[in-house]
Amino acid sequence: MAKGKKSVFFCQNCGHEEAKWLGQCPACGEWNTFVEEKLDSGITKGTTVSSRQTRESVREAKVVPLTEVTANDDARCRTGIHELDRVLGGGIVPGSLVLVGGDPGIGKSTLLLQVCRKLSEYKKVLYISGEESQAQIKLRANRMGDFSENLYLLCETNLEIISGVIEKERPEMVVIDSIQTMYSDEVASAPGSVSQVRESTNVFLQLAKGLCIPVFIVGHVTKEGTVAGPRVLEHMVDTVLYFEGDRHASYRILRAVKNRFGSTNEIGVFEMQQTGLVEVENPSEYMLSGRPENASGSVVACSIEGTRPILIEIQALVCHSNFGMPRRTAAGTDYNRVNLLMAVLEKRLGMALGNSDAYVNIAGGIRMSEPAVDLGIVMAIVSSFRNRPIDEKTIVFGEVGLSGEVRAVNMPEQRVAEAKKLGFETCILPEVSLKMVKGIKGIKLIGVKNIGDAVKII
């Protein structure tokens, strides 16, 4: 007699399980996230591949005093791609599980294939694809140049077969492309379902820790920009990297939103070319290329991403509104922050912006959320409103408070040094930060207490 199947409902956001459908998840509070999955009644909770492996390993587990554990940061493996190493915190940690997410066509597979190319020069690397054939991967690899014989390909989606190959071949690095295509025979649901993604990730986690090899897994993203599948997926891995950018543009930005072995503030900048992804060593110069001359509403500001200062062009367009409700649009920065700064300008400087449309854009498509760009947004709006260009060789940074004061920001000396290196002659910054940058020569420093002082300069 065939075994029956029972229905369970999983939350797509957090992976919470319920016996019946609910409108709101009691675990994470999200609405309309439960999906139904059919499970064999013969497979009970706790009898999947990973849980059986866990019970077997418990018998052999040994406790070790913390004082006897040796940890050497030199054990990190450099990928040879400096922008990626920067985001990872200095290289790949052995035994780590890294999730790489991003929109389709953004370059996730290309980046990981380039990592495999670098590491296969002196390590045995296994690239497992569930989406492409070996011939398709070879066509993509031909654009990048020659590959070492240490790079091996496996086109498979069955979790049990993949686990057996990894344990047999013992590679020094594994890439899984992608986690949504993997499935286990022990889980009675379709590939890409909540239970399949969770089970597959758990198995790869055990392989990474047990064999002490780094495992990279590619994850698709939803329309909201988060990794598809249960939210618990991001909790299970050691590092979560997001590949951002417009696939119709050439630049790409790699961000770490979770990193157990490094900072989550660093970014890596790449440019997509015919031969693959090329590192952009000086993002500031890249972001400012093509800036218009003597244009009102344009100003250069400086933001810090991790330890790296990046100069960006902030553009604003303020014009009379023909509608009863003026339009406010922000691209690359927080929309509510723009509204707040415009309210400060109206209240503290008496600017009549209530009947004006306002459009604020961070040129190049990069997104900045640091408060240090507040003063740049204010200056760009005033410049456009009064139709007065700001000197091209001037850079600004500072946080703006509700009283109109310009507050200090961190690392002002690095910001000024970056501006000087790129040929800027004047820097408008918070007055309280002047004493920290007085040692830098060759650039004129103007300290301001409030936005009124800054606006007088233009």
Please give the residue ranges for each predicted region.
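Peripheral, non-AAA+ core regions of ATP-driven protein-machinery
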Residues: K3-N13, E17-R86, V93-L99, I106-C116, ...
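Divalent metal-dependent catalytic cores for phosphoryl transfer on phosphate-bearing substrates
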Residues: Q134
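Conserved RecA-like ASCE P-loop NTPase motor core of nucleic-acid helicases/translocases
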Residues: V125-S129
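P-loop (Walker A) phosphate-binding loop of NTP-binding proteins
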Residues: D103, G130
